[in-house]
Curated annotation (Swiss-Prot):
Listed name of the protein: Oligoribonuclease
Residues annotated as catalytic: Y129
Enzyme type, top EC level: hydrolase
Organism: Haemophilus influenzae (strain ATCC 51907 / DSM 11121 / KW20 / Rd)
Family listed: Belongs to the oligoribonuclease family.
Record-annotated Exonuclease domain positions: 8-171
GO cellular component assignments: cytoplasm
Ion transport among keywords: no
Protein location: Cytoplasm
Domain of life: Bacteria
Coiled coil: none
InterPro entries, per database record: Exonuclease_RNaseT/DNA_pol3 (IPR013520), Oligoribonuclease (IPR022894), RNaseH-like_sf (IPR012337), RNaseH_sf (IPR036397)
Function: 3'-to-5' exoribonuclease specific for small oligoribonucleotides.
Gene3D superfamilies reported in the protein's UniProt record: Ribonuclease H-like superfamily/Ribonuclease H (3.30.420.10)
């Protein structure tokens, strides 16, 4: 185990939709890497129970995607509240990274942060105020060197742990091919 302020916390949420005022968190996963993107540990992968009423209000894309990937079944079987999932995630992170040290890392991470602020505020407060958003590099590559985008393809399972693993691989790809740091 390597508790280090240089470690990076990667997080992904699946939600019932995109508006934190109306939608809720349905899955959370975390991974801790070292500063060079080597995976040190995978945190708990937690399906968060939500009511059938809320699940039935999800749009067609969410209904189809989360049915096909098995997440809806896991949500219905789960007894975990958002608070319980938040506490389990914090317990994991406290073993790896001091509070306030790591930026929140992921793809389109500002969206996840909006939900954390509303439904998991203690977890939101655990991060440094900065973001490490892989989608920023994707947007820059699309504008400055679009051919770079051809070399990395995502599977898009829309399961939180898979999405984090892909984000880490994607950043490593951009580091090597776009930023040319390797």
């Amino acid at each position: 185990m390597s508790f280090d302020k240089q470690n990076l916390i990667w997080i992904d949420l699946e939600m019932t939709g995109l508006d934190p005022e109306k939608e809720r968190i349905i899955e959370i996963a975390t991974i801790v890497t070292d500063k060079n993107l080597n995976i040190l540990a995978e945190g708990p992968v937690l399906a968060v129970h939500q009511s059938d009423e809320l699940l039935n209000k999800m749009n067609d894309w969410c209904q189809k995607t989360h049915s096909e990937n098995g997440l809806i079944e896991r949500i219905k079987a789960s007894k975990l509240t958002e608070r319980a999932a938040e506490l389990q995630t914090l317990d994991f992170l406290k073993k790896w990274v001091p509070k306030g040290a790591s930026p929140i890392c992921g793809n389109s991470i500002a969206q996840d942060k909006r939900f954390l602020v509303k439904y998991m505020p203690d977890l939101a407060d655990y991060f440094h105020y900065r973001h490490l958003d892989v989608s920023t590099l994707k947007e820059l590559a699309a504008r400055w060197k679009p051919e770079i985008l051809e070399g990395f393809k995502k599977e898009n399972t829309h399961l939180a742990l898979d999405d984090i693993r892909e984000s880490i691989k994607e950043l490593a790809y951009y580091r090597e091919h776009f930023m040319k740091l390797d």
